[in-house]
Each structure stands twice: as structure tokens, then as C-alpha cells.
Curated annotation (Swiss-Prot):
The gene is nuoK. This is NADH-quinone oxidoreductase subunit K. NDH-1 is composed of 13 different subunits. Subunits NuoA, H, J, K, L, M, N constitute the membrane sector of the complex. The lineage of its organism: Bacteria, Pseudomonadati, Pseudomonadota, Gammaproteobacteria, Pseudomonadales. Keywords: Cell inner membrane, Cell membrane, Membrane, NAD, Quinone, Translocase, Transmembrane, Transmembrane helix, Transport, Ubiquinone. GO terms for biological process: ATP synthesis coupled electron transport.
Length: 102
């Protein structure tokens, strides 16, 4: 049984990373920014898994678990900041975060 070629998996990971990067740079809503970060982290995790599967090493899967753990921590902290931003300024615009000083 053969899997997908490594080039296809890495191309998919690169496309997902670029989509996340564009979403990160274009959007001003903090919720969409967090979602774009998650897409980028999942793309990196996919690249680790594809590379690990190519050489038959479990290191890619271990890195995937670490990336998922990091993504969960990032999401929880980001959502906590999002809630505080919305409660204080009644908006999800990232430009309002500059007013949080003081």
C-alpha cells in the first residue's frame, strides 16, 4: 500500500501555510487572525508528518503532537485576550488593542 507522494503533501502544506499567511496579513478581526494562525500551525504540522512518513521515522508524528499542543495553548491564550478585548472595547478589531495600554 502506497501513500501520497511527498511532493503532493508538501505542496498542500505550503498552500495551507500561504492561505494562513494571507489571512493573517489581510484581516483586522482578531478571531480571523487566530484562525489564520491555526491554519499556519496545522500546515507546519502536516509538513512534519509528511517528511516523517517519507523516511519512515516517527519523529514527524512526535512533532505533530508538539505542534498541536502549542496550538491549543495559543488558542486558549488568544481567546482569553479576545474576550477581554471584546468586553472592554466592544469590538474585535485588532487596532483597538493599541488602546489597552494604561
Amino acid at each position: 500500500m502506497t501513500g501520497i507522494p511527498m511532493e503532493h503533501g508538501l505542496a498542500l502544506a505550503a498552500a495551507l501555510f500561504c492561505i494562513g499567511l494571507v489571512g493573517l496579513m489581510v484581516r483586522r478581526n482578531i478571531l480571523f487572525i487566530l484562525m489564520s494562525l491555526e491554519v499556519m500551525m496545522n500546515a507546519a504540522a502536516l509538513a512534519f508528518v509528511v517528511a516523517g512518513a517519507r523516511w519512515g521515522q516517527p519523529d514527524g508524528q512526535v512533532m505533530f503532537i508538539m505542534v498541536i499542543t502549542l496550538a491549543a495553548a495559543e488558542a486558549s491564550i488568544g481567546l482569553a485576550i479576545l474576550l477581554q478585548l471584546y468586553r472592554r472595547f466592544n469590538t474585535l478589531d485588532i487596532d483597538a488593542a493599541s488602546e489597552m495600554r494604561g
